[in-house]
Amino acid sequence: MDQFAGPSQAVRCAPEIVRTANVVCTVADPVQDLSRALGDVDFDLVLLFVSPQADIAQIASRSIEVFNDSLVLGCTTAGELNCDGYSDGSIVAVGFPRAQFRARMLQVDDLGDYDAQTLIDRMIQGRNALMRDVPDWDYEFNFLMIDGLSRCEDKLTADLALGLGPVPLFGGSAGDGETFETTFLIANGKVLRNAAIVAQIRTICPIKVFKSDHLIPTEQRMVVTGAYPEQRLVYEINAEPAAREYARVLGKDPEQLDTFTFAAHPVVVRIGDQHHVRSIQKVAENGDLCFFSAIDEGLVLTLAEPLDMVEHLKQEMQALSVGGAPDTILACDCLLRKVEAEQKQIKGQISDILAKNRVVGFSTYGEQLNSMHVNQTLTGVAIYPPEHSTKTG
């Protein structure tokens, strides 16, 4: 990706419309550095994807001082997607200029205590307000960030779907590296936990919301015969202890199961005519399997095999460029995709493809698309230049 260093320690990528920049999270004033790198532009919305190594409270409070005329939203990550592809220990800023974008925020303060109908009503009201603000703009999407340890993604996306209408939604579950202890969101200077934020965005720029994974189902199936759905725990598969049976199906010793195993041998469930990934997070001390997304007794799990990750990603990016390359792709990429890339020693190649195609965003604990919460997937929005764009900066 074309990039240049600004008058600070931050690096700005160089799309024509959406502004993006990144900085090492340990510099003295990362938010100010990011602002300088983004340039003197009137932003309606600024997104911050923040390494868990950063001081999140300082980032949040500083963000409303520096970007005081903008809506500022963000979250902690399981890694960042910046100008060079995969990154750790950085902060990525994505600025949406007011000349081409309008945004409103829908905030869910407590994922354990919200009224679904009120949420739906607020989504509809927000969309109507954006339509009144810029009635001549034709394109809309919703971007969701949610606490990645809340185990509430499935319920929230199902509830939000009732208020979407024709407007697509995508998003990602906030991360904490590979520690899995605490994740945070940022909403206009406040730090939130067990919460979610939806950015409702209307734009003059054509957009395409997409979902991509490189997995194909095999004929090997397993049935969940014992589970605690609220905790996303499976204790029995095929009437056998869960971890032991999963290992047997793979031809492995249960003691060998680790994050690399789960990334290389995911399971999928069939919903309608599509398969969706249900990734395993870890093996509990008692041999239960902990999942990243919804699981229940009676669910049929199908073992999946990966296609060539590099070639598949190239093809997906090429498909998004038919008719013209995107200005920017805002993306949520599952942590397990990065783990797989590292394991197969192709992380550099994947990073090169992401950078070449101007993909920015973060590595997640899960991904959302419309009413679905999924795993081991890349979701995002490709943003294209309008035919008669007013360039910024």
What are these regions (language model features)?
Residues D2-G393:
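Hydrophobic alpha/beta core scaffold segments
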